[in-house]
Regions:
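Short, well-ordered beta-strand elements
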Residues: 1-14, 26, 31-36, 117-121, ...
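Short helix-initiation/N-cap motifs at beta->coil->alpha
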Residues: 12-13, 31-46, 148-160
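Ligand-binding cleft/hinge of the Venus flytrap
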Residues: 21-29, 113-147, 253-260
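Alpha-to-beta junction loops
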Residues: 48-57, 117, 163-173
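Ligand-binding "clamshell"
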Residues: 66-79, 168, 180-194
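A conserved helix-loop-strand patch within extracytoplasmic ligand-binding domains
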Residues: 76-124
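A bilobed periplasmic-binding-protein/Venus flytrap-type ligand-binding module shared by bacterial periplasmic
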Residues: 88-98, 201-215
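An extracytoplasmic/periplasmic, membrane-proximal ligand-sensing/linker region
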Residues: 136-150, 155-166, 174, 179, ...
Length: 261
């Protein structure tokens, strides 16, 4: 009888790509895999209530540590693998002169305020980058300088950036790595001396301890051995999001090429 695994996937493109890699590995082990896509906090809530057996991927400790702790109030979790090493950032297109804008403080310069798009378009409210960005806006006094930060959808964020770049506008984009925009565009990270954007996290698979029995020790070791990278995820995600290739096929082909299934 085929064993079934329900995987909670944070509903952003690179999380879907990473989850597709893991799902293909699970299928190769003989599992039937159902993926449920949810926003950040809802995904962790489903892990907590047992609606999903595992979650891909948790950014620990800074971005999602608070959500993981909430789950572990009711059920221990097992961390598996190192999918990539993500971090949050604020960036500008490389055509914005570094002499003018190299760090967040530079956004307060009068000459920069005149040229920079005042809208900073983010993603959904539960994302680490959104929480961090709201704090950056506050601590640097950017609202007082005329900037506005808006949470929104992933597409809102990417479209705003790509539209600005098409018009060679100066624009700030709250992003992270891995992200497929880095594959196509040269985005310069701004220094953020107050340390409000978190640290370099570990992106891992989380498995509820009460579901560990579904796996053999060898299968657990296989899941724990999975190592991708920011560049690998960004590359695969670009193929899906901008080249229109089928996600599960893209990740399946990559796993075969790299001898992982």
């Amino acid at each position: 009888m085929t064993k079934k695994i329900i995987m909670g996937v944070t509903d952003l493109s690179f999380h879907r790509t990473t989850a597709s890699l893991v799902a293909n590995v699970l299928k190769a082990m003989g599992f039937e895999v159902e993926r449920i896509f949810s926003p950040h906090q809802e995904n962790f809530e489903k892990l907590k209530t047992g609606q999903v057996d595992m979650l891909s991927s948790a950014w620990l400790p800074s971005s999602h540590g608070i959500y993981k702790a909430g789950v572990e109030e009711v059920e221990p979790l097992i961390e598996l693998g190192l999918h990539y090493e993500p971090y949050a950032l604020w960036g500008v297109p490389d055509y914005v002169p570094e002499a003018a804008v190299s760090e967040v403080f530079d956004l307060l310069k009068a000459e920069v305020v005149k040229k920079m798009n005042s809208t900073i378009q983010g993603i959904n409210p539960g994302a680490g980058i959104t929480r961090f960005s709201i704090q950056v806006m506050k601590d640097y006094g950017l609202s007082d300088a005329g900037y506005q930060f808006f949470p929104g959808s992933e597409d809102d964020c990417f479209s705003a950036f790509e539209s600005a770049v098409a018009n060679k506008e100066w624009v700030v984009v709250p992003l992270w790595k891995p992200q497929f925009l880095h594959y196509r565009y040269d985005i310069r990270e701004l220094k953020e001396p107050k340390g409000l954007l978190g640290i370099v996290d570990r992106a891992v698979l989380l498995l509820r301890d009460d579901k560990k029995h579904l796996f053999s020790e060898q299968q657990i070791q296989k899941l724990d051995s999975l190592r991708f990278s920011n560049d690998i995820i960004a590359d695969l995600d670009y193929k899906v999001c901008r080249e229109g290739k089928p996600q599960d096929q893209v990740t399946h082909d990559w796993l075969i090429e790299n001898g992982l299934i």
